[in-house]
Every structure is written in C-alpha cells, then in structure tokens.
C-alpha cells in the first residue's frame, strides 16, 4: 500500500492536486481513498460532491471522506477530557470554561490522523491520499507523535507508579480527582494509535510527502522550511508540484512580467530541491472542479508517470560504520550551521532547528559510544561516535 500526503501554503491548490492525484490513480485501477485532515474541508468543493466523515464511492476504484475532527476528538479524548474537566471543576473553574480548557488546541486535527492507520489496517485500498492542512498545522501534526512517544516512554511510567502509590492516601486527605487506571489506559491507547501512525508515515517503502507550491517567492521560502522540518522528523518528500504556471500561449502583455517572474522562480525551485522531481501544472482557464477536470489536471501533473510510484528515494536519517567509528547523518536541507543546536543527554540526542526540536533515542550501539565531533556538510548534520581511547569494547545488541 502507498500513502501520499499533500501539503503546502494555504491557497496554492494542494487540495486540487491531491484530488487530481486520487482521480488519476483510480483511473489506473488502483483502489484509492482520498481523505482530508484540513479543517477548511475543501475536498468536497474540489469534487463538487458532498462528502461525509465516512468513505463514500465517487467513481470506480475511487472513494473519498472528509474527516469530522470533532467526532475523532470525542472518540479519542473523551475519558481523558472527563478527568481534566473534573479536576478543573474541583479547582473552581466554571463548567463551560473547564470544558473549553480541557481540549488542547490542535488535538482535533491530530486525532484525524488516526484514520490513516485504520484504513491501512483495513487492507481495502492500494493508495491513501491525504489532503493535509496548510504547512504550519501539518508540521505540528506530524511532530506531535514523536514528542508524545518521548513522554510516554520517559515520564509516563514514573507518573503512573507515583500516582498508584499515593492515590490511597490522597483520597483520604482531599476530594481532588486523582487519575485512575482507566485514565492511564486511555493515554496509552492514544499513544499506541499515534505512534502507529508515525511508524506508517515514516516508512520509506510506503509513505511520501508531496509539496505543492506556486512560483512565488514567499511560497517557495515556506516550502523550503517545510522540507527542512519534514526531514528533521524523518518524513520523505518524493516530489514538488509547482502549480498555476502561466502557459506560453498567454501573450497578453499584462502577464508578460508575471511570466518572467514565474520562470525565474521555477528555476529556483528546480535548483533548490534537486534531485527531487519537480512536477508542474499550468494555470488553467477555469476552476478545476469535478471528476472530469480533475482527471485532466492529473494528466497535466503526472504525464506518463504512475502517480502511486515512489518518485524519489531519500534517506533523512542514517547510521553507518566507518572504521572503528559510527557516523549518524541527518539531512537538513536549506539550513545554515548557525541554526542548528545539538546536544546529548544519556541515551538521547537532541537536535533543534528553528522552532522545532527532535529527540532521537540512540540505538544501543551508539549509546555505548561518545560523541567525538559534529559537522554540517552539504546539507547533512554529521555526528561521529567512537569509544574513548583505551576503553574496551562492550558487547550488546543493536
């Protein structure tokens, strides 16, 4: 099975490109489901067909759904939310305010990703096309499972043991709500679901991200930052789609300057993202809405390509042995050395780029070694691990 995620700055046409990809895949005989995690819910507008939160067939081999984020929030967060509301009520917070405060902003969008795992597990489809929210929201979505994974593995077991130990005493001393096993089980269940999604989306044999851009300076700049942060968290970009290019046959002098500007920006995209394939779509003379026009756009974008293929293979993170040392290499395109912060604590390596931080749990082979040096060469952060001089080798599993 393949999973394709489409994202880009708001207004670039990512929903249209995602829908066109799904239509083209279905026409080739691949059982295709396209789903939207974007709160704007433009997918139904793109097909010009009303959609629900359940997959519905639009054409042979083509299904679509527009996720009800509130519904997913209630099914994933209900037990935890009830506890948080009870705690806030005990603390004197008004009931309505407690209800509002019990939901972390963005959780509804995050839970919509759990549908990805559900559809993969079902085995009903050959391709899952995900129309993601604009880039900032998508990055938050894709970075949360890893952050939660760190919390569950490092902090959660300690909290659970402490609460279990002191709960009998606290219930005698205070009326404050105390988390019970049901709440902890809900947190663990949520973690399993989100971590399962993370493993699927970082599987290089299954999942790819496709960035959609317009040939505009600010849009391209945001796409570069997005590519950097996706690489930081291990997500692979296999294509960039440049949408709404003014075609050569437009000869009106009003568009002459625009065509020159677009040509310059298109060259920038090709130079910046190489060797990632650059796909293009012209600015059509109408709205590309409905199955027939989306099929036309799919032909425009992919040409002779199979839309479901892995169009480019990248390796954001790799560990290789070099002599007696090991080199951990993390690809960080469009990054300056001064923007990167790296430090190690016990068996973890922390890498920060801009406002995003990733905690890498080192494999056991590297846990036994010391960091000797770090360098930034040709868009890769290279960190060399080796034993201290005179330190005997220790056995263990990788």
Across the structure, where does each feature detected by a protein language model lie?
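Nucleotide-state-sensitive switch-loop elements of NTP-binding domains
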Residues: 1-12, 16-195
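Hydrophobic residues embedded in beta-strands of well-ordered beta-sheets
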Residues: 62, 326-328, 347-349, 381
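C-terminal lobe/tail of nucleotide-utilizing enzymes
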Residues: 194-337, 350, 355-357, 361, ...
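Beta-rich strand-turn-strand
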Residues: 338, 367-390
């Amino acid at each position: 099975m393949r999973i394709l995620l489409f994202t880009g700055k708001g207004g670039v046409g990512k929903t249209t490109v995602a829908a066109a990809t799904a239509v083209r895949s279905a026409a080739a005989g691949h059982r295709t489901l396209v789903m939207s995690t974007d709160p704007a819910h433009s997918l139904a507008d793109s097909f010009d067909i009303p959609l629900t939160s359940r997959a519905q067939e639009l054409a042979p081999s083509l299904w679509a759904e527009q996720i009800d984020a509130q519904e997913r929030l209630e099914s994933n967060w209900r037990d935890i939310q009830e506890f948080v509301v009870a705690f806030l009520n005990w603390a004197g917070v008004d009931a309505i305010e407690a209800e509002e405060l019990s939901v972390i902003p963005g959780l509804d969008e995050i839970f919509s990703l759990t549908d990805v795992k559900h559809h993969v597990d079902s085995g009903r489809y050959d391709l899952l096309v995900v129309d993601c929210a604009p880039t900032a929201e998508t990055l938050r979505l894709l970075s949360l499972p890893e952050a939660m994974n760190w919390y569950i593995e490092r902090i959660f077991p300690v909290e659970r043991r402490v609460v279990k130990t002191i709960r009998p005493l606290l219930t005698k001393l205070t009326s404050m709500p105390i988390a019970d096993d049901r709440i902890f089980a809900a947190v663990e269940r949520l973690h399993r679901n989100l971590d399962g999604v993370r493993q699927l989306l970082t599987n290089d044999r299954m999942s790819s991200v496709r960035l959609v851009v317009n040939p505009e300076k600010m849009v391209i700049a945001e796409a570069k930052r997005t590519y950097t942060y996706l690489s930081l968290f291990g997500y692979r970009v296999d294509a960039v789609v440049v949408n709404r290019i003014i075609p050569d046959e437009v000869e009106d002098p009003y568009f002459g300057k625009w065509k020159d500007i677009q040509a310059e920006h298109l060259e920038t995209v090709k130079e910046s993202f190489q060797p990632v394939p650059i796909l293009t779509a012209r600015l059509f003379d109408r709205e590309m809405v409905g199955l027939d026009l989306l099929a036309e756009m799919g032909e425009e974008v992919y040409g002779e390509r199979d839309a479901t293929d892995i169009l480019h293979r990248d390796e954001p993170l790799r560990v290789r042995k070099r002599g007696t040392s090991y080199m951990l290499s993390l690809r960080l395109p469009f990054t300056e050395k001064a923007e990167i912060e790296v430090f190690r604590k016990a068996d973890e390596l922390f890498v920060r780029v801009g406002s995003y931080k990733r905690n890498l749990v080192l494999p056991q082979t590297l846990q036994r070694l010391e960091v000797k040096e770090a360098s930034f060469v040709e868009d890769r952060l290279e960190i060399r691990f080796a034993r201290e001089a005179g330190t005997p080798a220790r056995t263990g599993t990788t």
